[in-house]
């Protein structure tokens, strides 16, 4: 069989297995996830041995230190993967939940019931922990999942997927409900994206180039998990102590994640006082600032920002900064340059906070809180598959419910349409 034929078979088998997954009880799904967690912990030496092969190959290819760190698995990270499986097992099962019921004038009762999406394709890079994280969420929501990890993690991903599939076999659950595309070539991704007959949705997780490639080549609907160009606007009525604390946390706690702050906007009425203060605080923490002319007027030595800086997701200790005339200009800047991810306003003005919440288009909008709260666990959703920047079908951190859809259910007593 050719690569194209093999991938088509994987997708077709996943479609067949998805029907069995949709029927599986919550208890059966939870037992599976708990056994999977135990299997990962019990086989940590196998996983780390395969991971060592990937790390060695990555070093030979000249992967960056940051990439190698994302790729690396040790005992503590494997335990975290196992704990993640247990956390998903403990979450309420959304499948079969009836979310609304209402009675029509003709006495039929109408409701909406949560059902699995079907077959979910996940395309991701570097992090082999996504193999177990994504599998857990998709399976708990009653879906089949087709995984395609990065070529740099092929041995790690195959080892993890193999251990998870072993537990499915032992419980009599179709192994095809959890499939890993074993072909590291980019052609494997291209063929996967052609399987619209069998795969219901594609969720890509990775860098900007991967997302663009998937969107341009997919025949299947895509839920984009695009870059995080996250903003904070310091309003004229902001408490400076609060603003400084939130900005530092948003930018420096974990600068390499998608909910880290990338652009700071400051109201002109407080620029003369606040810009020098935040410049000093961030410089002490080794943050490189790139400012517009108005910002640099109060922060000598700051590098001039270019148009490209307003679009940039730095993922490091670099921050673009701009002084704006008012709330209108702040909102306009965010809606022009943002990536629909996460934005915050620091203000004591209730009316301004409400306008910001209503008019900013992003998936998570905060008032007087760090952008780092844009996370499924932090928002009370439990584990997440990622943060969607696509308004259809889900927007923002995607938990279990977002891996389902709804259907209408109708109860009658013999009614016919007149």
UniProtKB/Swiss-Prot annotation:
Coiled coil: none
Protein localization: Cytoplasm
SUPFAM superfamilies: ALDH-like
Protein EC: 1.2.1.41
Keywords: Amino-acid biosynthesis, Cytoplasm, NADP, Oxidoreductase, Proline biosynthesis
PROSITE patterns reported for this sequence: PROA
Origin: domain of life: Bacteria
Pfam families, per the entry: Aldedh
Single biological process term from Gene Ontology: L-proline biosynthetic process
Catalysed reactions, semicolon-separated: L-glutamate 5-semialdehyde + phosphate + NADP(+) = L-glutamyl 5-phosphate + NADPH + H(+)
This protein's GO CC annotations: cytoplasm
Alphabetical list of InterPro entries matching this protein: Ald_DH/histidinol_DH (IPR016161), Ald_DH_C (IPR016163), Ald_DH_N (IPR016162), Aldehyde_DH_dom (IPR015590), G-glutamylP_reductase_CS (IPR020593), Glu-5-SA_DH (IPR012134), GPR_dom (IPR000965)
Amino-acid biosynthesis is among the record's keywords: yes
Keyword match Transmembrane: no
One GO MF term: glutamate-5-semialdehyde dehydrogenase activity
Recorded metabolic or biological pathway in which this protein acts: Amino-acid biosynthesis; L-proline biosynthesis; L-glutamate 5-semialdehyde from L-glutamate: step 2/2
Family per record: Belongs to the gamma-glutamyl phosphate reductase family.
PANTHER family noted in UniProt: DELTA-1-PYRROLINE-5-CARBOXYLATE SYNTHASE, GLUTAMATE SEMIALDEHYDE DEHYDROGENASE
Role description: Catalyzes the NADPH-dependent reduction of L-glutamate 5-phosphate into L-glutamate 5-semialdehyde and phosphate. The product spontaneously undergoes cyclization to form 1-pyrroline-5-carboxylate.
Protein name, per record: Gamma-glutamyl phosphate reductase
Originating organism: Geotalea daltonii (strain DSM 22248 / JCM 15807 / FRC-32) (Geobacter daltonii)
């Amino acid at each position: 069989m050719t690569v194209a034929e093999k991938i088509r078979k994987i997708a077709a088998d996943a479609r067949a297995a998805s029907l069995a997954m949709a029927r599986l009880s919550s208890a059966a799904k939870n037992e599976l996830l708990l056994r999977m967690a135990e299997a990962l912990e019990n086989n940590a030496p196998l996983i780390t041995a395969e991971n060592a092969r990937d790390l060695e190959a990555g070093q030979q290819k000249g992967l960056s230190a940051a990439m190698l760190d994302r790729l690396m698995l040790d005992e503590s990270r494997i335990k975290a993967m196992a704990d993640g499986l247990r956390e998903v097992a403990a979450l309420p099962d959304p499948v079969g939940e009836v979310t609304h019921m209402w009675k029509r004038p003709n006495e039929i009762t109408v409701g909406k019931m949560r059902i699995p999406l079907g077959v979910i394709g996940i395309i991701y890079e570097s992090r082999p922990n996504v193999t177990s994280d994504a599998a857990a969420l998709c399976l708990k929501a009653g879906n089949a999942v087709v995984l395609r990890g990065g070529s740099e993690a092929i041995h790690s991903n195959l080892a993890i997927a193999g251990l998870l599939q072993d537990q499915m076999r032992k419980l009599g659950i179709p192994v095809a409900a959890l499939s890993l595309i074993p072909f590291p070539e980019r052609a494997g991704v291209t063929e996967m994206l052609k399987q619209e007959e069998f795969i219901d949705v594609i969720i890509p997780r990775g860098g900007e180039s991967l997302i663009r490639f998937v969107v341009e080549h997919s025949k299947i609907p895509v839920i984009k998990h695009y870059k995080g160009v996250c903003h904070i606007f310091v309003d004229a009525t902001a408490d400076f102590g609060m603003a400084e604390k939130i900005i530092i946390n948003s930018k420096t706690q974990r600068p390499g994640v998608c909910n880290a702050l990338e652009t700071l906007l400051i109201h002109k009425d407080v620029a003369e006082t606040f810009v020098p203060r935040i410049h000093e605080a961030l410089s002490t923490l080794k943050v490189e600032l790139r400012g517009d002319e108005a910002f640099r007027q109060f922060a000598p030595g700051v590098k001039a920002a270019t148009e490209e800086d307003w679009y940039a997701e730095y993922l490091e200790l670099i921050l673009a900064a701009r002084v704006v005339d008012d709330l209108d200009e702040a909102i306009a800047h965010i809606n022009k340059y943002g990536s629909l991810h996460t934005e915050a306003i620091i203000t004591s003005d209730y009316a301004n906070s409400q306008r910001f919440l209503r008019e900013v288009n992003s998936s998570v909008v905060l008032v007087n809180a760090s952008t780092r709260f844009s996370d499924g666990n932090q928002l009370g959703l439990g584990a997440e598959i990622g943060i969607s920047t696509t308004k259809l079908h889900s927007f923002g951190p995607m938990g279990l419910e977002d891996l389902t859809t709804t259907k209408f259910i109708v109860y009658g007593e013999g009614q016919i349409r007149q």
